[in-house]
């Protein structure tokens, strides 16, 4: 465990942009080190007080869908080298699960999510802010493949959700948050040059913290 504050790397971008691929590439490079991934997707608000018909209306691409207060509290605890109990979201019941995941503090924290750069409070806690920028056509294709294969969705339902929810929310909230990024990575996880540059930058920051 380091004596200094952990390094926080924020990785944002639209759904299907390749955030997870970039996150995994960075994590794999430093997996011999003290590193963890904290996903914003785990921090959707608890909706157990709402009837199912109301939960089904949830817009998961809107900033208000996230419990950023809890996410910030947990991130601050990790920065103080304290363990957290990460919540788990049940997409079947559209509310927070009773399950929790204990997370031990690490020297490097990768914070990943579509809207992490939209909240100034989260931005203030990040040492490096990345935005994974990928063409909209490629993002919808990736989302269709994921939702049909992994979540049992129909193609029509995925397209309908993209047109009526995902695209408008991306244009209104996610795309504008790109201006808060320190580095923009085009072509998502396929951009190995950009990922290598990021790995070098992170290694430099880690070395500087060790030598403080």
From Swiss-Prot:
SUPFAM superfamilies: P-loop containing nucleoside triphosphate hydrolases (SSF52540)
Binding site for ATP: 13-20
Family matches, as CDD domains: UMPK (cd02023)
Enzymatic reactions: uridine + ATP = UMP + ADP + H(+); cytidine + ATP = CMP + ADP + H(+)
Keywords: ATP-binding, Cytoplasm, Kinase, Nucleotide-binding, Transferase
One of the GO BP terms on file: CTP salvage
Gene3D superfamilies tied to this protein: P-loop containing nucleotide triphosphate hydrolases
GO molecular function: ATP binding; cytidine kinase activity; uridine kinase activity
GO cellular component: cytoplasm
Enzyme class: transferase
Pathway listed: Pyrimidine metabolism; CTP biosynthesis via salvage pathway; CTP from cytidine: step 1/3; Pyrimidine metabolism; UMP biosynthesis via salvage pathway; UMP from uridine: step 1/1
The protein's Enzyme Commission number: 2.7.1.48
Principal place of residence: cytoplasm
Domain of life: Bacteria
Subcellular localization: Cytoplasm
Similarity remark: Belongs to the uridine kinase family.
Protein name as it appears in the record: Uridine kinase
Species of provenance: Bacillus cereus (strain ATCC 14579 / DSM 31 / CCUG 7414 / JCM 2152 / NBRC 15305 / NCIMB 9373 / NCTC 2599 / NRRL B-3711)
Species classification: Bacteria, Bacillati, Bacillota, Bacilli, Bacillales
């Amino acid at each position: 465990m380091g004596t200094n504050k952990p390094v926080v790397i924020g990785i944002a971008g639209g759904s299907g942009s390749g955030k997870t691929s970039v996150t995994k590439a960075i994590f794999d490079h430093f997996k011999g080190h003290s590193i963890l991934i904290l996903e914003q997707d785990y921090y959707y608000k608890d909706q157990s007080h709402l009837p199912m018909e109301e939960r089904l209306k949830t817009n998961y691409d809107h900033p208000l869908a996230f419990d950023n207060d809890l996410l910030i509290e947990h991130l601050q605890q990790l920065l103080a080298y304290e363990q957290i109990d990460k919540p788990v979201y049940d997409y079947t019941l559209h509310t927070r699960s009773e399950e929790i995941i204990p997370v031990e503090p690490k020297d490097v924290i990768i914070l990943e999510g579509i809207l992490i750069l939209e909240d100034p409070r989260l931005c203030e806690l990040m040492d490096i802010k990345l935005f994974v920028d990928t063409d909209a056509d490629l993002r919808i294709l990736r989302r269709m493949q994921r939702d049909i294969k992994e979540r049992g969705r129909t193609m029509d339902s995925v397209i309908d959700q993209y047109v009526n929810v995902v695209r408008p929310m991306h244009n209104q909230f996610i795309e504008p948050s790109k201006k808060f990024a320190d580095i923009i990575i085009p072509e998502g996880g396929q951009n190995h040059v950009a990922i290598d540059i990021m790995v070098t930058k992170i290694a430099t920051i880690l070395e500087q913290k060790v030598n403080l």
